[in-house]
C-alpha cells in the first residue's frame, strides 16, 4: 500500500495486567501489522523491567530464547515476533531494560552531566526512559512507535515505566494511545467468566495516573456482549474499544481476529487520523490458507538441551513452521533432549525423522548426545541442519569418526584437547566480561558455487546474524575437505568458516550463524526452505 504522511509520530503503549505471559508481544505485533498494511511506517520496541543490561547472559530456562538484532544487540524473544510479523529488522533501540536505563544514568552522573544534583528515579530515570521511547520517532523514520511494557501493572519493578507512560501521555497529548491487556479467567465451578481481575488491574493503572484508551481481554473462548459492556462501564472505556483476544490455533491468526473487531480503525480514530478502507492483507491470508490446506506431514526432530522450555528455541520453531507451510506440509516437531540420546537409542529416537536440527547452545552439558545423534544422522543420510554449536558438533563428530582424530573437541569443552578443531576466536582471547562481548550481529558470507547451501540461497553472497565466541579451526581445513566435509561458506574478510556440508549426502549442512533470526512470515529464510524440501524428499 502507498505510504501515508503523518505530521507527528504517534506513540502506542501496550501494558499488561492480572498475570504475565498473556501475549502483549503478539498483540503489539498484530496491531503493528494492521497499521503497516494501511501504509504506515511502524516499529515496535520492548521495555523489560529486569536489571540485567540485556538477556545475553540469562539462562534460557529463565528467559527463553535470546534474539539478536541486525546491529548485534541481544534482546528479548518478543523482538523475533516483531520481525516475523512486520518483516522488518530491529535494532538496539528496539530493546531496553531497566539495567540499560540505570547504566546510562549512572554513566551520565559519573561524567558530571547532572552538575552535582541528586540523581533520583524521578526525574532522572523516568527522563531516560522517555528519551529511549522517543528515540525511534525522533528522525521521522516511523509514523508509529509501539512500546510494549514488560511485566504486569502493580509490579514494583514496572513502576518507573508506568510513570514514564503517564508523563508521556501528558506531554504528547493526542499523539499517544494506551492499550491495556488483561486476563478474564473462566471459573469452571461457576461456569462463568469473571471480570473482577480486569477491573482491579485497570484500577491499579488508573491509580498510577494512566487511563487506558483501549482494553484487550484475553480469554479461552469468545466473551458475550454483556461481559464486554460491563468491562467498558466499570473500566471507563468506550464499548467499541473493548477488544477480545481469544485462543486461536496459531498466533498468525491474531491480526485478522483484531482486524475483525476494528482495533486498528479504533486506534486511528482515537489518534485523530483518517481511517480509510480496511486493508485486505492478502499475502497474510494466503499464508494462513496454505496452513489450513496442508495435509501431508513433515516430521522434524530438534536435538537440544533446553527442550523442556517451549520458548528456548522459539525462532527455530517458528522458522521450521513457516518453511513447512510454504512447502505445503504440516510440521510435526519432535523435541529430543540431547542428554537423553546416545549410541544405543539413537535409532529409536531418530529413524523415523524426515529431518533433524541440531540446536545451538553453550557449554559441555548435552554435547555427547549431540555427537551420537549426528553420527547416526550422517551414517543414515537423514537431512540434518546444525546451527551454531550444532555446526561445531558436526565438525567435532566428523573429526573423531571420519578423520580419526581421537579426542578432537572444542576448546570450550576441553581446553587441553590435542585436536582443537573448534577454537576460541582470536579477538576473543583477551575478553574478560561475558555480557555483550561475543561476535554479534550481521556479517557477510560467501558461498561456494555448486554447493547445496548455495543452491538453497540461490546466490553466492549472503548476510546472516551471529552469536558465538568459537570458530572452525582453519588449520584443519584441508584435512576436512579431503575427507568430504567441505567448507562451503566463509567470511570474505576474515576467512572464518561459516558453513560446512558433507559431500555425497542429500543434506548435511552446518552453519555458524543463526538463520532463524531472519526468517519471517512473508519471507522465510532460504536455508530453512531448502532443509524442509530435503526432508520432504528424504
Give the location of each predicted region.
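Short, basic, helix/turn surface patches
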Residues: 66-78, 239-247, 409-422, 515-524
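Cysteine-nucleophile active-site neighborhood
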Residues: 22-25, 29-33, 37, 349-444, ...
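Flexible phosphate-sensing "switch/lid" loops adjacent to ATP/NTP-binding sites
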Residues: 1-332, 338-355, 362-363, 370-376, ...
